[in-house]
Regions:
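Conserved alpha/beta-hydrolase "acid-adjacent" motif
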Residues: 339-347
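Catalytic active-site module of serine/aspartate enzymes centered on a nucleophile-bearing elbow/loop
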Residues: 367-404
Length: 404
């Protein structure tokens, strides 16, 4: 695979942006301009380059609005996103909402009550003419992951769903996006609690808004990377009728342990923290990952964040059985053989003990970056959409007329 940067991590993150071009998330030329300004393993140059690109795109959008060019404005606002600080992410959300208002399908901005707070959410309704004739609209809940924002999730699911007659609900839960930065709510391993709150509100809003025509008997949950872990957790709720687990890990603690020197666990906490910070000064990727973990988990130190991440497992921890063994709905599990992470896809698949191989559980293992072999299927969204929606159509009994 061609690499834009020597760093596998930075190259993956660049592909993550570039891969959204087909769904209006970026313009290829703008990405190449940004890449020329980014230094390898330099977070500051990364931020500066994308900020400049976002500001230019936002200016273009405002100009297009002033002359009535909705198409240019939609493109511009969809890609003028920046997520560094609260002020920046708030601006990103505002621009995304401007883009949504210019889409050719309805978008509802919602709030989900959760433990005294209100989680922001979007409901992307299908494009007119794509609805299933004579039936209500099936629903996809797209849960984010470790470092995504829900505005990014649009490209991974809703952009394809709205063209195929599906409704998509995205939201930001504790430890994610603006909820983390504004409300200081931190991530939790038992994500089924969050999904339960989302489903409760979805049922209430659907009853209050019959015009949405939502089918509450056909709800799927979709997640990529850490979102795949969250999706499996959410699938414990029997209101979920299908689950897409895209490139997930079974045990996040194990992933951390495999990259940590064995002697660290025997050192005094303060000394271990100092040593860890020194070692990470030479490792950009791990330094970013642990620093982000400390933020999303609300810990005061990197070593404490490392301890907390051990709780994020599909194993029996605090349960009678591992999570996958209690899932009853059909599950599509995907692999990413070119992932920069060591996935545990086979372990997840084999743990779905209530499922029949190739029937109620299916494994998709694409070969090649262009076919979807990177983590979360970045840079291959058309293949992601084709595979996921073909499977969902079958499981949720969505009937389509063959093209002439």
């Amino acid at each position: 695979m061609y690499k834009f940067f020597p760093s596998d991590f930075l190259n993956f993150e660049f592909l993550r942006v570039l891969g959204t071009a087909p769904t209006l998330g970026c313009d290829v030329g703008e990405c190449l301009e940004a890449a020329a300004k980014i230094k390898n393993d330099d977070a500051e140059s990364w931020y500066t380059a994308w900020t400049e690109a976002a500001e230019k795109s936002e200016d273009l959008g405002e100009q297009a609005i002033s002359i009535g060019d909705k198409e240019t404005a939609r493109w511009a606002f969809m890609r003028s996103k920046d997520t560094r600080l609260l002020k920046a992410i708030s601006k990103s959300v505002d621009d995304f909402k401007k883009a949504c208002a210019l889409l050719d399908s309805p978008v509802e901005c919602l709030e989900i009550p959760y433990e005294g707070f209100r989680l922001p959410a979007y409901l992307f309704l299908p494009k007119r003419g794509t609805e299933c004739s004579g039936r209500k609209t099936p629903i996809i809940i797209n849960t984010g992951g470790y470092d995504s924002i829900q505005e990014e999730l649009y490209h991974f699911t809703a952009a394809g769903a709205r063209e195929r007659g599906y409704a998509t609900l995205t939201f930001e839960g504790p430890g994610q996006g603006i909820v983390l930065r504004r409300e200081k709510l931190h991530m939790r391993p038992d994500w089924e609690v969050v999904i339960s709150a989302v489903l409760d509100q979805l049922f209430i809003l659907s009853q209050q808004n019959p015009g949405w025509n939502l089918d509450l008997t056909r709800i799927a949950i979709v997640g990529n990377s850490m979102g795949a872990y969250f999706a499996l957790r959410g699938a414990l709720d029997t209101r979920i009728k299908a689950c897409v687990c895209s490139d997930g890990l079974y045990d996040f603690g194990k992933a951390g342990r495999e990259r940590t020197p064995f002697f660290m666990k025997d050192l005094p906490k303060n000394f271990a923290e100092s040593l860890l910070r020194f070692v990470l000064s030479f490792d950009f990727r791990t330094r970013w990952e642990l620093a982000h973990a400390a933020m999303v988990l609300g810990t005061g130190s990197l070593s404490e964040a490392f301890d907390r991440i051990q709780e994020f497992t599909l194993g029996p921890q605090g349960r009678e059985r591992p999570v996958p063994e209690d899932i009853t709905c059909p599950v599509l599990v995907t692999n990413a053989r070119d992932s920069i992470y060591r996935l545990e896809v086979t372990r997840i698949y084999d743990s779905l003990t209530q499922h029949k191989d190739g029937h109620t559980k299916v494994l998709w293992d694409p070969i090649g970056v262009g076919q979807g072999s990177t983590q979360a299927k970045v840079a291959a969204l058309s293949h992601l959409h084709a595979t996921v929606f073909e499977w969902l159509d079958r499981v949720l009994e969505v009937k389509r007329i063959p093209c002439d």
